[in-house]
Amino acid sequence: MFRFDKEQIVLDIAGTKIGGQPGEYPTVLAGTIFYGGHSIIEDEKAGVFDKDKAEALIKTQEEMSDVTGNPHIVQTFGQTPEAIVKYLEFVGDVTDAPFFIDSTSGEARIAGANYASEVGLEDRAIYNSVNMAADEAELEALKETKLSASIVLGFNPMDPTVDGKIGIWEDGAGTIDKGLLEMAAECGIDKYLMDVAVTPLGQGAGVAVRTSFAVKSKWGYPVGSGIHNVPSAWDWLREYKKDHKEAWPVCDVGSNLIQQMAGGDFVLYGPIENAKMAFPACAMADIFISEAAKDIGTEPVEDHPFFKLL
């Protein structure tokens, strides 16, 4: 195991601590709800859904968080402005946990950010994300909200190397006019969650994971990813699982452990239905890391899985 010379920044988002030295704080786990095709949704555009089932899913994640000691975030996805506001209103009522404001639509993301600001949920809200594709209108609108936390996505299609990813955060790497960190700061963001933008196997997945070390060595910011997307994009596994369904959850949930072992502070582990698999697996990895890091001067916090599960 390893310890960074750079002082590590620990974010406090509504009482949830994200960051620190490997083995110090437990990995924060975010499960996605209201994703495209989610069975609990009745109308994706209008945001009509089964509230009882949605609450049960969130409460299960909450319970697993209590059991293992791994804090949780509700990754709240919405396709439209109307839908995401309804989802955020619901999430804000049923849990005290932080939540991601997530959508493929910039208009929907801003609608969610505006809603969170208007009703006093800005301290729990995390924008997803400031990235190279964000246009001026979205950035200007984000600036007008009260949000202070955001994922900053290190995706650089022109140069997917470690240096290319660092560059897109630092100065734009010749691809955009300024670095993503500067762009985020101009929008009022001062709590950066650095997403290393893991791409498919054979197309830079390993490089993205290695970027985790670089981020924490250079800036000390919390780092993580939605690494579970890697198995989803693996053609061989998609074919193999047709006859071997048991292989899928092993790779899907297991991918998160790779991010953790590379110094990750948070993982977006996929559908919230996977909470009962993801939390024990990630808690186990945290115990491994913490035990290994003790000899080099890193002590786990009181509610770490090392103390809760041993």
Curated annotation (Swiss-Prot):
Pfam families, per the entry: MtrH (PF02007)
Pathway: One-carbon metabolism; methanogenesis from CO(2); methyl-coenzyme M from 5,10-methylene-5,6,7,8-tetrahydromethanopterin: step 2/2
Enzyme Commission number: 7.2.1.4
Catalytic function, reaction form: 5-methyl-5,6,7,8-tetrahydromethanopterin + coenzyme M + 2 Na(+)(in) = 5,6,7,8-tetrahydromethanopterin + methyl-coenzyme M + 2 Na(+)(out)
Family as reported in the entry's similarity comment: Belongs to the MtrH family.
Function of the molecule: Part of a complex that catalyzes the formation of methyl-coenzyme M and tetrahydromethanopterin from coenzyme M and methyl-tetrahydromethanopterin. This is an energy-conserving, sodium-ion translocating step. MtrH catalyzes the transfer of the methyl group from methyl-tetrahydromethanopterin to the corrinoid prosthetic group of MtrA.
Protein's UniProt name: Tetrahydromethanopterin S-methyltransferase subunit H
